């Protein structure tokens, strides 16, 4: 089932998400719906807060980026209760976009490597060290479960320059190819 994407300005995007337990209701169905919604929206990642749930669930498929970023080849994950344990010292700046911030793309500086621990959809524990764009994608989605957005990492001047676009998103004056929920009333369209 396709789920609507919650847009910038909705309070759920600013909540720190909670860990879940293996008995979370209909978890497999939720993961399948999140994955379907991510693909339908042409995304490479989706976090549960982006569909209105303040829980620590991420779905990622960065494989479409493999031609430009070989480290993304086959990089498909479900990450539950993820926690970044360590961030590398080397930084890299790349453009990022977000389904919750349609039509906004900004340069974001992030560590080029991370160490993350999480459980998968079967609640099997994992710990991985990720590098390059795969690390960037995970950090971007991880921000969502910590109540952050990629625009929180840009300069005040850049934020000022996109202020009008952000206001339009809040007002629902934005076109998308996917269903959305806008702020502050949670109106669906």
Swiss-Prot record:
GO BP:
co-translational protein modification; translation
Would the keyword Iron turn up in this protein's UniProt record?
yes
Q: What is its EC number?
A: 3.5.1.88
Instruction: Kindly list the positions annotated as binding Fe cation.
Output: 98, 140, 144
Query: What's its catalytic activity?
Result: N-terminal N-formyl-L-methionyl-[peptide] + H2O = N-terminal L-methionyl-[peptide] + formate
Keywords linked to the UniProt accession = Hydrolase, Iron, Metal-binding, Protein biosynthesis
Pfam families in the cross-refs: Pep_deformylase
Q: Tell me the leader sequence span.
A: none
Q: Which cofactor does it need?
A: Fe(2+)
A Gene Ontology MF term for this entry?
A: peptide deformylase activity
Catalytic residues identified in the record: 141
| Cofactor annotation remark | Binds 1 Fe(2+) ion.
Q: Which family does it belong to?
A: Belongs to the polypeptide deformylase family.
This chain's function reads: Removes the formyl group from the N-terminal Met of newly synthesized proteins. Requires at least a dipeptide for an efficient rate of reaction. N-terminal L-methionine is a prerequisite for activity but the enzyme has broad specificity at other positions.
Q: Which HAMAP family match?
A: Pep_deformylase
What name does the UniProt record give this protein? Peptide deformylase
Cite the source lineage. Answer: Bacteria, Pseudomonadati, Bacteroidota, Bacteroidia, Bacteroidales
This protein's gene is called def
